[in-house]
Amino acid sequence: VVGNIGNAYTKEALYTVEDSVTVAEISSFQLETIHDFLPHVAAILNITPDHLNRHHTMEAYVEAKESIVKNQTKEDYCVLNYEDSYTRDFGNRAPGNVIWFSSAQKLENGFYLDEDVIYKAVDGKAEALFNIAETKLLGVHNMENIMAAIAICDAFGVPMDSIVASVKAFRAVEHRIEYVATKRGVDYYNDSKGTNPDAAIKGIQAMNKPTILIGGGYDKDSTYDEWIESFDGKVKLFVL
């Protein structure tokens, strides 16, 4: 993984060959200044208010995120979340082939979650891939992440059996609802990557027991009403 997380892309570029595939996490800050950057397969998992202290308006933030595909052609692919209003609208303008995923409804084409099973649909014909109980991740948002990853690999022609086996073996990465330990019957999770209200809400929603939430950080000109509302029925104590 290179880019905004992992190693610097410039360093890894020294070791790539013609058929190399790199996974790049690109921030809105980096996308502001791209010129020739052209990912064969791009993905936008969701767009929610963030970094408004930098971009000032939601419109400017969305424009920066969408620029990831500005150099794509009809030979390229863009993986988008059908349940996000911004990405669904953007799908009508994307220059490449759009691959949808959905955690809430069946799709004619794309990947979707239905009754704890993830499916791949082509022209209305759906193939069951696996039950989410076979994965090691928590939360609906992680099922969306899984579907996006499957779509990306599928676009590159990776055999589906290999994709599914990798999904089942994958464990949460650090700082993302990362299981830490169980002490005296209490499970501890590190979700410090939840640095905006939407990400923090998804972490709370993934918890299936009464939760003590420890939070901190600095204000990025976000609104916190929905985040606080998500405490209801989930968070029994908040430590700030």
Task: Report residues per predicted region.
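Flexible active-site lid/hinge loop adjacent to a nucleotide/diphosphate
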Residues: 15-104, 112-115, 119, 130-137
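Short beta-strand-centered segment that lines the nucleotide-binding/catalytic pocket of NTP-utilizing
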Residues: 1-8, 26
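Cofactor-binding loop segments of dinucleotide-utilizing enzymes, especially the Rossmann-like FAD-
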Residues: 4, 103, 216-218
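Conserved beta-strand segments of alpha/beta enzyme cores
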Residues: 97-99, 187, 237
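Short internal beta-strands
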Residues: 78-82, 214-215, 234-240
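Beta-strand->loop->alpha-helix junctions that form or flank phosphate-binding loops
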Residues: 2, 95-113, 164-168, 178
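Nucleotide phosphate-binding/pyrophosphate-handling subdomain across enzymes
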Residues: 130-235
